[in-house]
Amino acid sequence: MSLPNCPKCQSEYVYEDGILLVCPECAYEWNPAEVEKEEGLVVIDANGKQLADGDTVTLIKDLKVKGAPKDLKQGTRVKNIRLVEGDHNIDCKIDGFGAMKLKSEFVKKL
């Protein structure tokens, strides 16, 4: 049976210790069954609700946009969002502005 590389440092020198797998290089221990169960990206809006791809959200405050002649106003509706990794974790298109990246802390789910 071949063992997976360490999820922390990608070392190939992993060994079994009971039900856990152990990496001797970084001393990381993990249960391979739990790694498979982990969920992907979790994004929370300003009210604490979990967002998903395709949701519709509204802005909770005015946002200044660099290089744009006007701001995004509070209450602007954003349809069909896509969640991505990073500090600006919402990728979307806004009518009148085009493609934008937003932070989830400035939106609420409808």
Swiss-Prot record:
**SUPFAM superfamilies named in the record:** Prokaryotic SH3-related domain, Zinc beta-ribbon
Query: Coiled coil where?
Result: none
* Gene3D superfamilies to which the protein is assigned, alphabetical: 2.20.25.10, SH3 Domains
Q: Which NCBIfam families match?
A: phnA
Family under the similarity heading: Belongs to the YjdM family.
- Name recorded for this polypeptide: Protein YjdM
The scientific name of the source species is Streptococcus mutans serotype c (strain ATCC 700610 / UA159)
